[in-house]
Amino acid sequence: KERTESIDTRIYDPQDGKYKVKNCKVNFMVYQNNELINNDEYQYLHLMNSIMNYGLPVEGRNGKVMSSFGEKMVFNLDRFPLLTTKRMGYKTILRELLWFIKGSTDNQELVDKGVHIWSGNASKEFLESRGLDYEEGDLGPIYGFQWRHFGANYHGKHGSYVDCGYDQLKWLIQEIKENPSSRRLILSAWNPAFLDLMALPPCHILSQFYVNQAEGTLSCQLYQRSGDMFL
């Protein structure tokens, strides 16, 4: 449950050496019943704490970061599949996923739906910094393109790719139906030959699926090479 309250905060004014009281609105996230807490979430919170306290300081592409390697989290998707201790843009997540599944590389399609998470990487300035002479909004052969047209030559966001490349997603769905015990149920967005053509190389690069026929369940293991854990 979320509530908003007005509280008085004392702010020090260095010019006159006095404290001033300022009324501020603060959002609180409140649990009414501890039994309702998403237990799977504790592993996420524990990992955040571990990175902050024991992570390795690294100077990366985006400046200084705290780094950790080989961490693992397991979530039961039969229960509530989202974090509850921070705001989660469910519609944004869903729209981006559907955009990936479509195989699109055109950021404008996301913008038209109110999704701007790729806009910073789709600007002409950013694309030029990557050495890419694309039209603004063209993200190159990123996730969805690799899922639906793996290996196809890239001709820009307006290109026609019908029957071009290998449709991994189509194959994966068919293979799960016809050969559920296969150990090759893999979906990959990592194509080394195309990394320099992408606005950004993929972060979640590989997913492997596992069918438990006895229980009638489908599990997914995802490998993510890099992630902004606190966003």
PLM feature segments, named:
Residues 17-231:
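Terminal, non-catalytic protein-protein interaction segments that mediate quaternary/complex assembly
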